Amino acid sequence: MSKAREIRTKIASIKNTQKITRAMELVAASKMRKAQDRMAMSRPYASKIRKVISHVAASHAEYPHPYLQQRENIKRVGYIIVTTDRGLCGGLNVNLFRTAIADMKKWQADNIGMDLCVIGRKGEAFFRRYGGNVLAVADHLGDAPEVQDIIGIVKVMLDQYDKQQIDAIYIATNEFVNTMVQKPLVRQLLPLKTDEEEVEGGYWDYIYEPDESKDLLEMLLVRYIESQVYQAVIENIACEQSARMVAMKNATENAGQLIDELRLIYNKARQAGITQEIAEIVAGAAAVE
């Protein structure tokens, strides 16, 4: 019967764990919906500001802004890596690291150096071990970060670009496809390619003064980069909560299956114990007779 008591203890322990994973699943589902709402609200801003940049740049083509010009000799590139602060979100970070490293190896093959700015504690820990040149880290952003929280890390990378210490900037993040699918990707932030189709397809009857258009374009480009990084951060949060919800759901279901298996083992052990006791009683009665 001692074995049966051990099994009962295991069942009770797993039930407690199951309650925790179920609660975490519900919390993650709630946070995911909020993150999706923030993600949807920020997209129109980034889309509109890119259109404005395309028109302003086209109206003042004689002023080639450095953020819009492809550099011929690329000697060093920068990466902004967007990860999570916490774990328990499946293979979200691991898949992103694998994608980012695969992209970085293309530059390494050409002996091109790399600088990193990392968002999230998981990314910081990984690239400290991996050996990347981490310039800046932003962590503890929470579940509802503001644009101000990422301005510092963006400025570090833009300063490097302005000083020509790096010749291109890329961002590695997770794209939210749906609740079950999160896609790791790497895309180029700078130099920015203007939307030529948007310029040709629409006509804005605006007159830009040369000096003012330069200042406007400078401000818009910086704001656009900030908005892209912020969009990546909140989209990564939606991916994190979605992956955590799925992981906790699977953990809850696995706990239920394990409890069922242990109950079956417990019932068999209890039945064997009762059978043994009956056999001992019968044997004792027979000995008395």
Swiss-Prot record:
Belongs to the ATPase gamma chain family. Keywords: ATP synthesis, Cell inner membrane, Cell membrane, CF(1), Hydrogen ion transport, Ion transport, Membrane, Transport. CDD domains: F1-ATPase_gamma. One of its GO terms (molecular function) is proton-transporting ATP synthase activity, rotational mechanism. F-type ATPases have 2 components, CF(1) - the catalytic core - and CF(0) - the membrane proton channel. CF(1) has five subunits: alpha(3), beta(3), gamma(1), delta(1), epsilon(1). CF(0) has three main subunits: a, b and c. InterPro entries: ATP_synth_F1_ATPase_gsu, ATP_synth_F1_gsu, ATP_synth_F1_gsu_CS. The gene is atpG. This is ATP synthase gamma chain. The keyword Transport applies. It is a peripheral membrane protein. It is found in: Cell inner membrane. GO terms for biological process: proton motive force-driven plasma membrane ATP synthesis. Its main location: membrane. One of its GO terms (cellular component) is plasma membrane. It comes from Coxiella burnetii (strain CbuG_Q212). It comes from the Bacteria. Produces ATP from ADP in the presence of a proton gradient across the membrane. The gamma chain is believed to be important in regulating ATPase activity and the flow of protons through the CF(0) complex.
